[in-house]
């Protein structure tokens, strides 16, 4: 695959080309041709905001996609292509889970660093993305929590919360 080739060669174009191939083959071809540009914009948005909350309503406002259902459909297609994943906010109310923004993660940090729009390394968000990908392999239900405090990941198996995980690049008094 292309990702190991990037590690060996170090050529950032390899990751960009691989990302474009996945985007066209697994996402864009499933939609009408006029949505190609907006899908690329949504993709860039997700890459640039990895490990941050995202609202489908805000994405529809920022792009040419005026129908929120279309934005949701694009996000679902990204998930089916194993390119992006979205987790809900933990709440005991399903309605509140559905109403709150989701946090998005990318299958590979190489795509985030090579294709995404960034001004800094933002190691904390990249680390959180790596932790998410590893947690995804556990097959547990993954949520984030925000309320009186925040927690990057809340894991659930059946009706039991099994873990709460906070990811941080640097631990200090402000983020304990």
Predicted regions and their residues:
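Short amphipathic alpha-helical interaction segments
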Residues: 65-80
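A cross-kingdom feature that marks ATP-driven nucleic-acid transaction machinery
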Residues: 76-176
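Hydrophobic (often cysteine-bearing) scaffold residues that line and stabilize catalytic clefts
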Residues: 15, 35, 70, 123-128
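Interdomain motor-coupling "hinge/lid" segment immediately C-terminal to the ATP-binding subdomain
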Residues: 1-53
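Short, locally clustered residues in the helix-turn-helix/winged-helix DNA-binding domain
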Residues: 44-48, 64, 136
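A short acidic, leucine-rich amphipathic alpha-helix
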Residues: 57-61
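C-terminal helical "lid" subdomain and adjoining coupling/linker elements of P-loop NTPases
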Residues: 29-34, 62, 89, 93
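Phosphate-coordinating catalytic segments in nucleotide- and nucleic-acid-processing enzymes
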Residues: 9, 62, 69
